[in-house]
Amino acid sequence: MTPHIESKKEDIAEVVLMPGDPLRAKYIAEKFLTDYKLVNKIRNMFGYTGYYKGKRVTVFASGMGIPSIGIYSYELYKFYDVKKIIRIGTSGSFNKNIKVLDVVLSEGAYCKSYFDQLFDGNDINFIKSSSSLNKTIKKTAEKENIPLKFGKTITSDVFDLYSSSKEKFKDNYPEDDYLAVEMEAFGLFYLANRLGKEAACLMTVVDSVYDDKSLTSEEREQSLDQMITLALDAAII
């Protein structure tokens, strides 16, 4: 037990899927896992452990933003001996080559947060995800005929849709081709790197400044299910 997780150590699997939304964690457990049980409900940050294709896996919500995922991923890595975390979620994009419903795998995250400085005194703006875990995810996507966009992404402290000027928002970042914008990956990758663990981030793009496509609830669910299945299949390899 930690200040934020009530689970016993044996309740948590070595591999964790981490959606931001607690209700998405519940949805994944109910739809994809067998013999699952609720292992955390503190602050309604739901965690479930069950079996997928006979392999044990935990689905544990992170909440939104680096501070929240920083707490949960650190405690899972440090106190529960979790080896791998695959973040799964949604993202936006201001890349002309990325369309709504594209699935993006982050090669690494650029961020202007002070998380690294406050955690252990470092001052970096970019950190890579785990190459071995990415390799597994890419091979799984190829096997399942899921088109995957692989490249650098941005982790922001501001929800980009609420930025007063999207062009100014974009100008805050380097000119490199960043595929997607989300709010958690940098913190997850940083902690995995410092603690000698593995981390990856899969995202389904749900909004873009270059694509006005409006998703129906059915389209959103189906696209997320594809990403969830990809993450689960990669997690059990």
Residues covered by each model-derived region:
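Zn-dependent metallopeptidase/amidohydrolase metal-coordination segment
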Residues: 186-219
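Short, basic, glycine/proline-bearing loop/turn elements
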Residues: 55-62, 169-177
